[in-house]
Amino acid sequence: MKVYVNGEILDEDKAVISVFDRGFLYGDGIFETVRSYGGVVFCLKDHLDRLYSSMKSLKIRQSLSNKEMEKAVYELLRINNLEDASIRITISRGISKQRVFNISQNEVANVVISAQSFIPRPIEFYEKGINADITHFKRNSQSLLSRFKALNYLESIIVRNEAIPKGSFETIFLNEFGYVCEGTVSNIFMVKGNKLMTPSLDCGVLPGITRKIVLELASYAALGTQEGKFKEEELKDSEEVFLTNSLIELIPVVKIDDRRIGNGRVGHLTQKIHSLYKELVKKEIKN
C-alpha cells in the first residue's frame, strides 16, 4: 500500500516522519476520516473545510492548499487502485526541538494521507441494531478540543475498550452536567414522535459532517429537528436511537446499558433517514 507523506507517495514501510514530530510527541495535530464510494470521496469539500478551519484556529501552518490536498487524496486512491475506501488525512504541527509550549511560526505542518479498502460493518448491525453503553467518565463541554478532531484519542480508546467485553459496539459520553454528549467516534440521534433530536454543540459535541447532513435530511423524512440538552433518561426513553459518522453512515441502537430502546427493533424513521443518506451518496457519485 502506498502512503502520501509531505508531497511524496511512498511504500508504507518507507513512509516515516521525524521522532521530533509534535503530533507524535504531544498529540499536537488534527485529522479527518473520509469515505470514498466508487472512487468518489463523499463530502470531501466539507471535510477539508473543517480541516483547514481547524488548522487556522489552532495556528497550524499550512503546507498544502485546499485544492492541493484534494488532488493528493485522489492521486493516492488512483495509485492504490481503490474505489471503496476509508481515507485518513493526518496533520501535525510539524517538527520542533523546542519545549512543548513554544510554538514556532517557522514550523510547517506534516501531512500524512493513508487509504485502505473499506471494510463495512456486519450487515446485521444495520438490520438488527447494536448495543451501546454509557461510561461514567464525562466529556468536558468547555474543552477547547471538543470542536476539533484532535490526534489525542486516549480517552475514547480507554472507554471503548472497557465496553468490548460487555458486547457493546459504542460507548456514549455524558458531559459534566449530565447531558448526553456523543459516542467515542460518533454523534448520536434520538427520535420521539415526529422529531429528530441530537445534543447541541455546546454540550461538547464534535460538529460531525454526517451529523450536519442528517439534520438537513430530516425534513425529507417529515421530521422536525431539535438540537438541545438531553438527560440520560430522555435518551433511553427514545423511540429510536442511531449513531452517525462518515464510515458507518447511520447505525441503529436497540439497547443502551440494559435498557431496550423503543420496541427493541430498528426503527422505520432510522431506516428512512439512512435510505435518504444513501440516495445522497449515489447522487454525488453520479455527478
State what each model feature region is.
Residues 186-187, 212, 248-251:
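Glycine-centered loop/turn positions within well-structured domains
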